[in-house]
């Protein structure tokens, strides 16, 4: 990757959910994501493979920037020990601006609740494209919405 075009951004969000519960929702039960955070991700479609398997291809319908954006991604890796999942963008709106883009989510247990870290690794198509810093707020909103829903479910 060219150093002037490549980048990495991260954000960490504290949540009340257990690390395992958040990880399972975000890595193992993707089909439930629209129920957990309908304001951020109203729809997700399985295009190829099986939901829980590396290599599966999904279309994420993101409510982002005042419109619905589609991101076609491959489920690249999952690590049950590190509570980490990586998705690589292979189509959709992001390929209009980025040569490569990965979404990495990792959850860290805390005494109470957990810490969710989102990392974006990317290479822009050209220097005129801004770094995707606004996606950090999207990640924070998404994380809080999932957490709120998981907490409501756990109290039922």
Model-derived segments and spans:
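Hydrophobic ligand-binding cavity/cleft-lining segments
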Residues: 1-53
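C-terminal helix/juxtamembrane-tail motif
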Residues: 2-4, 133-156
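A generic structural micro-feature
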Residues: 3-5, 50-52, 65-69, 95-99, ...
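Hydrophobic/aromatic beta-strand elements that line small-molecule binding cavities or substrate pockets
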Residues: 11-13, 71-77, 101-109
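Structural signal for hydrophobic/aromatic residues that build the beta-strand cores
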Residues: 22, 26, 58, 75, ...
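Glycine-rich portal/gate segments that line the openings of hydrophobic small-molecule binding cavities
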Residues: 36, 43-95, 153
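Beta-strand/loop substructures that line and gate deep hydrophobic ligand-binding cavities in soluble
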Residues: 86-141
């Amino acid at each position: 990757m060219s150093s002037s075009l490549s980048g990495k951004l991260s954000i960490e969000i504290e949540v009340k959910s257990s690390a395992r519960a958040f990880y399972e929702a975000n890595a193992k039960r993707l089909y439930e994501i629209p129920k957990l955070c309908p304001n951020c991700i109203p729809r997700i479609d399985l295009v190829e493979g099986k939901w829980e398997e590396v290599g599966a291809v999904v279309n994420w319908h993101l409510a982002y920037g005042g419109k619905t954006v589609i991101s076609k991604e491959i489920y690249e890796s999952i690590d049950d020990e590190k509570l980490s999942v990586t998705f690589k963008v292979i189509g959709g709106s992001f390929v209009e601006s980025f040569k490569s883009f990965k979404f990495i989510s990792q959850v860290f247990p805390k005494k109470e609740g957990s810490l969710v870290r989102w990392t974006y690794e990317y290479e822009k198509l050209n220097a005129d494209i801004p770094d995707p810093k606004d996606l950090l707020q999207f990640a924070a909103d998404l994380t809080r919405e999932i957490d709120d829903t998981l907490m409501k479910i756990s109290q039922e």
